[in-house]
Amino acid sequence: MTKPRTQLIFLWNYVEWGGAQIFLLAIMKAARADWDILVVLPRGSMPTILYFLDDLGIRYEFLDVAIQVSEAPGLIDKIRRQWRRIYAEAVSLKYLMRFDLKNSILHIETAPWQSWLLLTALAMRRAHVFVTMHNFMPRSSKLREMLWRLRLKFVSGLPGFHIIPSNQDTKDKLSGWVRDDFWEKMIVAHTAIDPTEIDAALESEFVRSETRMRHGIDPDNFIVLCVGQFIDRKGRWVFLDAAKQVIDKDPDVAFVWLTPKLPDEAENARIVEYGLGNSLNIVLSDSVGKAREDVLRFFRVADVFTLPSYVEGLPIALLEAMALNIPSISTRVYAIPEAIKDMETGILINAGDSEGLADSILRLKRDPELREKLARNGRKFVLENFDERVVAGKVIDSYKRSLEGK
């Protein structure tokens, strides 16, 4: 008789998708042959992530609740957001009670220093819980940081609980915030790329001028691309400020931002103030195609990739751009220097430095030999160090050890 497959449940409580979901999809790809996989996500989730799940043949179910991930500007908004998070976690816990958690793996996207009550309740059910941390917590008041430290010390002592840092920077910074024995056992499972998808995107038929024109991009311009959510922590206004500086000096440069969600009315009003006109195109990722290969192929419209983030782990979009042979510029924050070695595999600038970003873009435009060097070295470094098949194997091994009580 065939042994039933072990249940592997992935859960997140927000409708947006990004690098965190790409990280989990890599694990699903590697695990789907041997595990019974279920994804639990909010109703109303962006269609692209559902397409990715369908493409992999992954079963999913919806919860009728979602948290707010955008910034809460006022005190009342912050209180509402916290209450919504607590309510969403209560709904999630009630849903999860139908499963044999003692003999399953639960991999959830949550902040363990906030969701300690949920994690405690799951530990009482003898669940095997894994949480990915893509970056260390943002700096806050001494009182709040003390509270976070106490909570992390507590949850790191819960049986069956695991944190998987997706980069070395996050693990290093967690030292002293979690129990020492817990920290020693944490494995780093880097954000990573799928080399087969990268090669497929590079080898597939692609006419750059036609793709550019199809999305309103001048086919003859030097294109600077950013990919990710159009939000503050990704450095969106730094990107636009640098764009204005560059275009004032060289009007043959244009800027493109590929995003899963277009700006709202207030954001568009602020964008207009930069006066970039046709030199800026914000493109909805759904419009370039539904498959991962479609998104990766779109990267090839770019001459240079940049991600001027303030807060970031090890961003998948940056690794993908580098693997696709695109010279890349990003910020020396969190784990980004684990991929970009300044002037060797890319260019590093300080977060918030729009002038530095503009200068780096112009330098690359004027120096094709430097572009070729950074593109070649960047691709080689990513392919050698950030292969998702290796990373997924490490995570799945951790699942198995947890079930074995190790």
Where do the language-model regions lie?
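Short hydrophobic beta-strand element within catalytic cores of glycosyltransferases
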Residues: 327-330, 340
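Short alpha-helical donor nucleotide-sugar binding micro-motif in glycosyltransferases
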Residues: 292, 297-302
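Nucleotide-activated donor-binding/catalytic signature segment of Leloir-type glycosyltransferases, i.e.
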Residues: 268-289
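A conserved mid-protein helix/loop that constitutes part of the nucleotide-sugar donor-binding site
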Residues: 18-26, 222-245, 355
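Aromatic "clamp/platform" in nucleotide-sugar-dependent glycosyltransferases that forms part
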Residues: 310
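Short His-centered aromatic/hydrophobic patch
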Residues: 108-114
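Conserved acidic donor-binding segment of nucleotide-sugar-dependent glycosyltransferases
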Residues: 342-343, 347-354, 363-368
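A short, active-site helix/loop in glycosyltransferases that binds the activated sugar's phosphate group
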Residues: 158-185, 190-200
